[in-house]
Amino acid sequence: MKSTDLMHIEPLELYVGKPYKINDKIICLQPTIGDIIDYGETAYFSILHTVCATPADMKVRLFDGGINWMEIDNFELFSMIAPSLPVEQTSIILGDLNLSALKTYRSKENGEIILANPEQRVKIDRLIYERMINCLRKMHGLKANNEKAHNKATMRAMIENDRQTMELNSKKEPSSYLLPLISSVRCKMGWTKDYILQEGIYSFFDTVNRLNVIDNADHLISGIYQGTVDSKKISKDQLNWMRELK
């Protein structure tokens, strides 16, 4: 029996590459490594992070637009961003859902702001948004950035720090995030290129994380037998490489 928790996502379904159905109009797709390469790795992670962005992620842009990032929530930011995202860019993760066709309305039920396209009978309220973004983050191992500043001086410092980071990153040569991971998995697992191209992004990241857990457990066990690691200071969970990854 499946969980009745609306925020729950079956990890096994993600692992085998199943799309996650929010409702009849909204489905989160899981691309393969090959899909991401064909789309363009840089463009893919750019659109992913834009869709999943929190106000803290965009504090510089919001500040430059006269908005304090701590005075809006995640859904309000998404409502601002969504109309600028054409379906051609988002289709790799959201299929036919056209965010650029959505407009802001007030719900007749509770007065809350919603995004909707009445002609297509598409509606995104806060709950639907949270379910959609929760799925995309879980697929890619992303954590929400909800950092806050405790005073104005700290706020200005955080904004300037992010601005400097953005400027430095803009001057760097483009590099691949996936290549070192793919290369490592191939060397460790002996997978062929064709096999990796067919791997869903969730199962691929799961493999990367699992390999790290296995290596760590092996080193701990080796250290225990050699007498260089005190077994009393190591939890049994750390030695169990088949444990659930979190």
Model regions and ranges:
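Generic structural motif recognizing short loop/turn segments at the entrances and edges of beta-strands
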Residues: V16-K18, N23-K25, E41, E88-T90, ...
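Hydrophobic, aromatic-lined core segments that form the binding pocket/scaffold
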Residues: E76-K171, S175
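Long, intrinsically disordered, low-complexity Ser/Thr/Pro-rich regulatory/activation regions
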Residues: I224-K246
